[in-house]
């Protein structure tokens, strides 16, 4: 059974139809990459998976997004609970700059009412180890998170996301602002994280999609102002070497987009 399933998903911002008729499945403990030209809706779909797009006034979804068979848009489902179960790492690292490294990691736990200092310290260490950051920061946990390098800040944000023990981790271009060395560190981390988490990543870097993902979804749009759509999804090797759709092949080979 798929961990995540989108059935006839259409996404709107007020009267604007942003994405149309997306159907896809994401297996548990795998990495799925979303690729496609700017404006095709891949980040919009990503944000709809944990209801983050709803912070935009007038945004809504038609269709179903199923997590372990349950529609996350069901009438009795709490969006905050959805965001705890489905974590998000954004394009720009966004640690709380004046908060200590340790407090950054456990901010979500504290927000949900956890006060046991021993547990908070244990979770902070476990999460920093999980984000391959512990050895670099273990002697300065009380220092501000804003003092870390860009790559370290992004891994700190990943540690913060996994501290609340989500089942799915969404990543919206997590390496776009990073140098090649920091990018490699995050990519290595993604390979390790999929042992425990289901990951969906949006990337403009097709080489990155090829390196880190098990399956790839290609999105496109017919023209500016038209809805984005899912053109094709399949095993990453097949999408990059022998896609079913000419549109996919043209994008990957650099003929458009």
From Swiss-Prot:
Organism superkingdom: Bacteria
Protein topology in the membrane: Peripheral membrane protein
Molecular-function GO terms, alphabetical: ATP binding; ATP hydrolysis activity; ATPase-coupled phosphate ion transmembrane transporter activity
EC number(s) on file: 7.3.2.1
Localization annotation: Cell membrane
GO CC annotation: plasma membrane
Binding site for ATP: 36-43
ABC transporter domain segment(s): 4-246
A biological-process GO annotation: phosphate ion transmembrane transport
Alphabetized SMART domains for the sequence: AAA (SM00382)
Keywords (A to Z) from UniProt: ATP-binding, Cell membrane, Membrane, Nucleotide-binding, Phosphate transport, Translocase, Transport
Cited Pfam families: ABC_tran
InterPro entries in the record: AAA+_ATPase (IPR003593), ABC_transporter-like_ATP-bd (IPR003439), ABC_transporter-like_CS (IPR017871), P-loop_NTPase (IPR027417), PstB-like (IPR005670)
Reactions that this protein is recorded to catalyse: phosphate(out) + ATP + H2O = ADP + 2 phosphate(in) + H(+)
Function: Part of the ABC transporter complex PstSACB involved in phosphate import. Responsible for energy coupling to the transport system.
Self-association and partners: The complex is composed of two ATP-binding proteins (PstB), two transmembrane proteins (PstC and PstA) and a solute-binding protein (PstS).
Family as reported in the entry's similarity comment: Belongs to the ABC transporter superfamily. Phosphate importer (TC 3.A.1.7) family.
Protein name (record): Phosphate import ATP-binding protein PstB
Organism: Corynebacterium glutamicum (strain ATCC 13032 / DSM 20300 / JCM 1318 / BCRC 11384 / CCUG 27702 / LMG 3730 / NBRC 12168 / NCIMB 10025 / NRRL B-2784 / 534)
Source taxonomy: Bacteria, Bacillati, Actinomycetota, Actinomycetes, Mycobacteriales
């Amino acid at each position: 059974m798929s961990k995540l399933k989108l059935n006839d998903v259409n996404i709107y911002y007020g009267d604007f139809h942003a994405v149309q008729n997306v159907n896809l499945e994401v297996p548990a403990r795998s990495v799925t990459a979303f690729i496609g030209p700017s404006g095709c809706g891949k980040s919009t779909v990503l944000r709809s998976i944990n209801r983050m797009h709803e912070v935009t006034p007038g945004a809504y979804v038609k269709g179903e997004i199923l997590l372990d068979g349950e529609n996350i848009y069901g009438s009795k489902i709490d969006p905050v609970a959805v965001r705890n179960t489905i974590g998000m790492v954004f394009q720009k690292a966004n640690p709380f700059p004046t908060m200590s490294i340790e407090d950054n990691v456990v901010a979500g736990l504290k927000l949900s009412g956890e006060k046991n200092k021993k547990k908070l310290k244990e979770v902070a260490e476990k999460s920093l180890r999980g984000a391959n950051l512990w050895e670099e920061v273990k002697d300065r946990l009380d220092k501000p998170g804003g003092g870390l390098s860009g790559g370290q800040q992004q891994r700190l944000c990943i540690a913060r996301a996994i501290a609340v023990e989500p089942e799915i981790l969404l990543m919206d271009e997590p390496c776009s602002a990073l140098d090649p060395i920091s990018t490699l560190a995050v990519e290595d981390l993604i390979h390790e994280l999929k042992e425990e988490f289901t990951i969906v990543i949006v990337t403009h870097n097709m080489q990155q999609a090829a390196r880190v993902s098990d399956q790839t979804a290609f999105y496109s749009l017919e023209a500016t102002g038209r809805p984005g759509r899912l053109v094709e999804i399949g095993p990453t090797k097949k999408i990059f070497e022998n896609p079913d759709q000419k549109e996919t092949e043209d994008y990957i080979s650099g003929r458009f987009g």
